[in-house]
Amino acid sequence: SNHPRLIEGAKKMMDKRGFGMSSVRFICGTQDSHKELEAAISDYFKTEDTILYAACFDANGGVFEPLLTDQDAIISDALNHASIIDGVRLCKAKRYRYANADMADLERCLQEAQEQRFRIIVTDGVFSMDGNVAPVDKICDLAEKYDALVMVDESHSAGVVGATGHGVSELCKTYDRVDIYTGTLGKAFGGALGGFTTGRKEIIDMLRQRSRPYLFSNSLAPCIIGASLEVFKMLKESNELHDKLVENVNYFRDKMMSAGFDIKPTQSAICAVMLYDAKLSQVYAAKLLEEGIYVTGFYYPVVPKGEARIRVQLSAGHNREQLDKCIN
């Protein structure tokens, strides 16, 4: 978020195009830079087309209702993000929920949904509370077996997971097997705001015609577009930032485990330090803040009872001195 190239990209685009668009996309809110960013996202995810939203909450809220009817089925992971849950609620499709990353339970749901016209499996790429990665390759195997579409929310995985940070499809080798991706420009891709849906062209075309958050929300501001374009240029030029992130995550996790802490297994930048006691998680977070370390204590109802933890979000911007201060 503080990288000088992003800040300069935002400034240049605002100087060139102004502060805001004052319109939705289909009236007079589309500039060539919006199309350029959509093309950059498609290139990054190896997809055919992309549609931009004001936030990923809007992307997830606007993806199901245009595509599915009461004759169809949505099969959703139990730990999917709230935006997916709300998007499913806006749709008349029959709903199934399977236990987190449980392929046997997913198969049970798919078998039950065989009478529906279309089926879509929906999962986070990385689950935001635990930091675990969805087994997207196995999900795709079941989707092919039971003739279902696959949708992955890459908000917590894109830019982080995979050999070069291209997300779960790079990690699981599932390019061309995932039909729809959603994601955010508010985490690894700049940290401000903005969301997107990317995938097969016919799906994106339908969303452009019928997705209400896209049709009735103002376009992303030029400064967001300018910074986001710079993000994808940087990621294409070098893997340095991703490599630094992976180094930081591995160092922090290994040192914390050596110190006796219980850390949820993860390949992501989310490190859940398990404390299991709600009050203790609040006290720990408050004491760390007094030391200049900003972390968040999570407890019921955000996480299940008895699963209280501190969630540490690492970035490529952290240096070794900062990590050691937190660990010690």
Tell me the role of every PLM-derived stretch:
Residues S1, D243-F252, M257-G292, V302, ...:
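Conserved PLP-binding catalytic core of the aspartate aminotransferase-like
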Residues I7-C56:
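Conserved N-terminal alpha-helix of the aminotransferase class I/II PLP-enzyme fold
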Residues K12, K16, A39, D43, ...:
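PLP-dependent enzyme catalytic core of the Aspartate aminotransferase-like
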Residues V63-A82:
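Conserved PLP-anchoring active-site segment centered on the Schiff-base-forming lysine
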Residues D70, L90-K92, Y146, R177:
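Short, structured coil segments at secondary-structure junctions
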Residues Y96, N100-V152:
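Active-site phosphate-binding strand-loop segment of PLP-dependent enzymes
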Residues Y146-L149, H156, V161-Q267, L280:
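Active-site C-terminal subdomain of aminotransferase-like
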